[in-house]
Amino acid sequence: MAQQEASPSPGAEVVGRAFVEQYYHILHQSPGLVHRFYQDSSFLTRPDVTGAVTTVTTMQAINDKILSLKYEDYTAEIETADAQESHERGVIVLVTGRLTGNDNVRKKFSQSFFLAPQDKGYFVLNDVFRFLEEKEVTAQARSVPINGTTRDVQAPIEPERVVVSHEPEVEPEPVASIEEEDLDNVAEVYDPSDKDEGVVVDVEPIEPPTQISHNEILSVPQGDAPKHSYASILKQMKSSPAPTTHVARNKPRPAPVNQKLTAPPAEPAARPEASAHENVPNSSHVDVEDDGHSIYVRNLPFDSTPTQLEEVFKNFGAIKHEGIQVRSNKQQGFCFGFVEFETSSGKQSALEASPVTIGDRQAVVEEKKTNSRGGGNNGGSRGRYFSGRGSFRNESFKGGRGGGGRGGYGRGGGEFSGRPKSSNPRNGGEGYQRVPQNGGGGRGGRGEGGRGGARGGGSS
């Protein structure tokens, strides 16, 4: 009965996240320990230098194959990691990302695992790795010139249409039915990918109703007025027979946008680009580059407080007023924080001192990287993976810096812990050790990392 109650506790996504974090961290930090994720019945498939794919089995052969590929000379950038429950309570994990070598060449790859259950967790039964060919999927979107005509800008993008009722006369109720989020799409900044060096402005031509010009429609999202001011305009329109005069007088800048609609392709790019940014001052797609002197601290205890972080990091330099944030997600099993220093020297000192002890954890200090798609200036939603040795662009993948624990990780998202019964790779480790079901992680084996969570190492 105990086993039946414990088995459904960790979901496939929890198991997948914990495994991916530990696997890639150890793969690039301590590749000589990766074979402990496998057993003699496991199969591992890898391409060689010629592109031919070979499959090996047994822990010794798997260890030899992994060591021959020199993973310590690469860094992994994980883009996606998906997991599903499979046969006999197993878990399938599909990972995509990029490997960057010492020559700074980035290669896209795909890797799939089948995690088979065992008494103390899971082990890798199947492992298939493939490099993928880069395809210019978004090339057309990138090549769209900002200074082109409206027809050229429309080509690669199909935005939401502005719904305007084509009535012979403008009535208050049809105008009031225009939703604000639809009007926001009249001029929107489009970011096709992280790698684009610029933005593409999408200006949607509108077939206006009677008595409403292009200038008046496009001027609604311009200026510094908040969205709710447009609602007040709609209220005035209900009581006024000439609502268009209010829109046109309040917005002084429709002319540049109108010129862009009729301008030839040789129009300079500066004016429409600036106009687009003014049109959408609150757009969540605009990247914020300046983060001051901030650091990102992961693997914090769940009960961490800003005061606790201040006691540790004030030793490295002056901290800005209210410059400390602590966030946690107990459901996903992680806690992290941000610290903003007054000077770059304080930030650099904290980075060099990583890892630091906070509570009962070895917290890892990294430079705060902003790629806000809806995050604003406060660190925002860190919903995208970022590059690093075995690190990930999703907070649920933040883990420790352990140099590789001994054994495996628990089904509840615990540590890569436990000791193998022999150093000989043929004898194998004990697999991933089961830990308490609350995902908090028990005390791990010996390694260079901290404790708890779904992590790559035990306490030192």
Curated annotation (Swiss-Prot):
Biological process GO terms, please? Answer: regulatory ncRNA-mediated gene silencing
Locate the compositionally biased regions of type Low complexity: 383-394
**Could you tell me what induces this protein?**
Probably regulated by the microRNA MAV8.
Matches recorded under CDD domains = NTF2, RRM_SF
Q: Where in the cell is it found?
A: Cytoplasm; Nucleus
InterPro entries per UniProt? NTF2-like_dom_sf (IPR032710), NTF2_dom (IPR002075), Nuclear_transport_factor_2_euk (IPR018222), Nucleotide-bd_a/b_plait_sf (IPR012677), Ras_GTPase_bind_prot (IPR039539), RBD_domain_sf (IPR035979), RRM_dom (IPR000504)
Sorted alphabetically, the Gene Ontology cellular component annotations on this record are: cytoplasm; nucleus; plastid
Region feature Disordered, mapped onto this chain:
207-226, 238-289, 361-460
Positions of the NTF2 domain:
15-131
Name of a matching Pfam family: NTF2
Composition-biased stretches (Gly residues): 373-382, 399-416, 450-460
The chain positions of domain RRM read 293-370
Give the knockout phenotype.
Reduced DNA methylation in some of the targets of RNA-directed DNA methylation (RdDM).
Q: Name one GO molecular function term.
A: mRNA binding
Name the UniProt key words of this record, in alphabetical order: Cytoplasm, Nucleus, RNA-binding, RNA-mediated gene silencing
Q: What functional role does this protein have? A: Involved in RNA-directed DNA methylation (RdDM).
Q: How does it assemble?
A: Interacts with MBD6.
Q: What is the name attached to this protein's record? A: Nuclear transport factor 2
